[in-house]
């Protein structure tokens, strides 16, 4: 089962835009419920805190996803992803993947060196050694925060159908991400109604997905740009991850009184 791994794939792409206010600060934490139909099958939390790495101040993000209830009894999943991010550049300096899915386990650390080479970055994995990649490369979580700061703040410039293609480092390899913009919609969640930006991350057809459009993602169209709902259409049915709680947001969450479209 690669549910939480897939969840990570879809919230990324880096695009530089200097001088904008950050959409988040350390102390932000978001809680999600993961449901299969009316049955809750798991929970997830995403938070970022102030920390240090090699004596320097960093922002430490942690994404935890795990099964609950009957799903946990049938197939236990506990996936933890961590990113240590430079506040100024918003680039990762350390990425950690620690997953348990049934009997399968994997632990991987990658150190990012963005400065030793002028034309590329050096990535050192504890599993596969040294890799030379393009400058400005992100890991999964740092890309998520970079997305909120440097692309979604300018969403008025996006047109329906616009496609963004980026390259990220995940599971010890370069992985292309394609994100298609679908427009703005108002949706109802467990914390209230809100205007959202809707995206289809183009997924890889195969073991999980039947088509390239089987994942849909909603970000709040306010100053926070929080991911509040993710819908997965996979071979066995539809899973939905939805926000159920939050704290430490930089800006008040903008809630609506009426639905318009979903």
What are these regions (language model features)?
Residues 13-14, 21, 132:
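Generic alpha-helical structural signal
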Residues 20-114, 153-262:
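Acidic, serine/threonine-rich low-complexity disordered tracts
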Residues 108-153:
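Hydrophobic, well-structured mid-protein blocks that either form specific transmembrane helices
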